[in-house]
């Protein structure tokens, strides 16, 4: 009798519920991740990409520079550049536009000079009283490392390019050979592709044939610093006969 009662009690406590395998919780974060990624991608495309920009990324680089599509794309970028508030701010602050020495950095003026890269020449402004130089560069989608973000090496190249231009303007000659002794880069925020960036050099100091200076790369509004840098260059006068 007691045996039957004990067996009944055991069956009561072992009715199968205890041994039931718990179902795996649904991964609700996956749909939200997909939604969030799609939303951010869509926002970026609407804010920073036009149909012309997409064409420049996919097919304009295969066309000659005098093709109608490429010429119109360059004209559109220059119109966008002229409409930036930073342009008027620089002019009001006493900066004057100067002609950049395109032969100084062939990587920027030649290799990267393509639709989707640095499609138009950078616009350079100089203020002799403040000894500051500002460059406006358009960085396209072909210069990305991670999706929609400009590669850090490209940013360093652009900063170094303007630093050399600043030294050339300070010395008053483009016939000068410059060597980068050291370049220190500090990345503060990611830089979105397909927008203009503002590069400004400051604190230029000369010690014989060496020049030290600082620079910062900002977004196209000029309000957010994305990269900071400082560098030392050595300079030697070139052949006077090559001076133009």
From Swiss-Prot:
InterPro entries: HotDog_dom_sf, PTE-AB_protein
Membrane topology: Multi-pass membrane protein
Residue stretches spanning the membrane: 29-49, 139-159
Main subcellular location: mitochondrion
GO (cellular component) term, any one: mitochondrial membrane
Gene3D superfamilies named among the record's database cross-references: Hotdog Thioesterase
Keywords: Membrane, Mitochondrion, Transmembrane, Transmembrane helix
Places the protein is found: Mitochondrion membrane
Family per similarity comment: Belongs to the FMP10 family.
Additional information: Present with 1920 molecules/cell in log phase SD medium.
PANTHER family: UPF0644 PROTEIN PB2B4.06
Name of the molecule in the record: Uncharacterized mitochondrial membrane protein FMP10
Lineage of origin: Eukaryota, Fungi, Dikarya, Ascomycota, Saccharomycotina
């Amino acid at each position: 009798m007691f045996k039957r009662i004990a067996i009944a009690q055991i069956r009561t406590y072992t009715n199968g519920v205890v041994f039931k395998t718990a179902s795996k919780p649904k991964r609700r974060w996956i749909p939200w991740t997909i939604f969030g990624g799609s939303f951010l991608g869509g926002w970026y495309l609407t804010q920073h990409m036009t149909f012309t920009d997409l064409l420049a990324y996919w097919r304009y680089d295969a066309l000659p520079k005098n093709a109608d599509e490429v010429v119109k794309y360059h004209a559109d970028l220059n119109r966008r550049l002229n409409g930036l508030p930073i342009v008027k701010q620089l002019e009001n602050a006493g900066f004057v536009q100067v002609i950049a020495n395109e032969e100084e950095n062939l990587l920027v003026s030649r290799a990267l000079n393509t639709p989707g890269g640095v499609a138009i020449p950078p616009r350079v402004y100089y203020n002799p009283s403040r000894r500051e130089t500002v460059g406006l560069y358009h960085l396209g989608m072909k210069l990305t490392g991670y999706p929609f973000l400009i590669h850090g090496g490209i940013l360093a190249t652009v900063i170094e390019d303007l630093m050399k231009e600043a030294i050339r303007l300070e010395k008053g000659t483009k016939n000068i050979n410059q060597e980068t002794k050291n370049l220190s880069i500090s990345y503060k925020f990611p830089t979105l592709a397909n927008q203009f960036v503002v590069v400004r050099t400051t604190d230029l100091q000369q010690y014989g044939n060496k020049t030290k200076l600082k620079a910062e790369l900002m977004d196209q509004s000029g309000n957010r610093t994305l990269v900071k840098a400082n560098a030392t260059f050595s300079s030697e006068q070139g052949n006077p006969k090559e001076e133009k």
